[in-house]
Amino acid sequence: ISANVLNMTAMTITTKYQRAQLRINLDNELTKWLTLSTKINASRTHSHNGGIDIMNFLNYSPTMEMKDPVTGVYNMDPYNSVNGNPYGARVANYGDSYVYALNTNMDLTFKIMKGLTLSVQGAANYSHVPSYSFTSSLAKPGQLSGMENASRMNLFWQNTNNVTYNTSFGDHHLTATAVFEVVPKAEI
């Protein structure tokens, strides 16, 4: 069992990143004929104003007037860039994105008789990725204020069943396996 928590303020202004994660790996011999193996990974991440356009930052004139003193709108660079003011984009706009994820796997292995096993495996992957953003009319000249909300969810699961027979006779070894697998198409 392990866990980690990360809470950091990034190198750029108004940027923050948080992550919490829990991982569990358990292998248990429940009886002489049954083994249970479980793997679980759960996490949550949050990014506030993540991602920057580094080329836009590097191309902007370092000595230009940042804001129009009358309107409060962040000025465009008149010489080096056709993009909006990167500083204005950082301080006037707002964005949050999250990732909630759960990955699980379980295996029940039945020892039916000497050399014969049945493995019943199940796995599921779930993710939910909501994001929210606000674009301010102060970020650059002519910019309209706007908001955006988005959400994406995925759920995938799988069931795999293996029957395996292992035996040796003389100088020979035989392994025979039969597999049945179900992988549905999931849309959320």
Residue ranges: model-predicted function:
Residues A10-Y17, Q21, N25-N103, S119-I188:
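Surface-exposed loop/interface segments of Gram-negative outer-membrane beta-barrel transport/assembly proteins
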Residues T109, M113-K114:
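Long hydrophobic segments that form regular secondary structure
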Residues A3-N7:
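Transmembrane beta-strand segments that form the barrel wall of outer-membrane beta-barrel proteins
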